[in-house]
């Protein structure tokens, strides 16, 4: 797999999980002889929701909730076959979404 690049994008609601997963991926890739660029923190996406506190009156009284989606991006330059096999066998936590582009 010469002159190729693997781009890995991680998404999670908990920043501790995403940092731990990124560290595992970087460690695995470096151990198998690949060059890793990143992890680069991408902007956190914040979704806010306004909910009425009362079912009947008091329209001005509201609760605000938010969901924060943290993202990390990393590139693996010139991956070897061992790198790809090791990344496929890697077990990441359930709360982390992984997108891989070759």
UniProtKB/Swiss-Prot annotation:
Single GO MF descriptor: structural constituent of ribosome
Alphabetized InterPro entries for the sequence: Ribosomal_uS10 (IPR001848), Ribosomal_uS10_CS (IPR018268), Ribosomal_uS10_dom (IPR027486), Ribosomal_uS10_dom_sf (IPR036838)
GO BP terms in the entry: translation
SMART domains named among the record's database cross-references: Ribosomal_S10
GO cellular component: ribonucleoprotein complex; ribosome
Keywords: Ribonucleoprotein, Ribosomal protein
Domain of life: Bacteria
Listed HAMAP family: Ribosomal_uS10
Similarity comment: Belongs to the universal ribosomal protein uS10 family.
Function recorded in the entry: Involved in the binding of tRNA to the ribosomes.
Name by which UniProt lists this protein: Small ribosomal subunit protein uS10
Organism: Cupriavidus necator (strain ATCC 17699 / DSM 428 / KCTC 22496 / NCIMB 10442 / H16 / Stanier 337)
């Amino acid at each position: 797999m010469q002159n190729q690049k693997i781009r890995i994008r991680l998404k999670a609601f908990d920043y501790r999980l995403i940092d731990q997963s990124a560290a595992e991926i970087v460690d695995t890739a470096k151990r198998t002889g690949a060059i890793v660029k990143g992890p680069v923190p991408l902007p956190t996406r914040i979704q806010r929701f306004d909910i009425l506190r009362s079912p009947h009156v008091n329209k001005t009284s509201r609760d605000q909730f938010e969901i924060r989606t943290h993202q990390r991006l990393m590139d693996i330059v010139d991956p070897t076959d061992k790198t790809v096999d090791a990344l496929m066998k890697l077990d990441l936590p359930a709360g982390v979404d992984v997108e891989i582009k070759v």
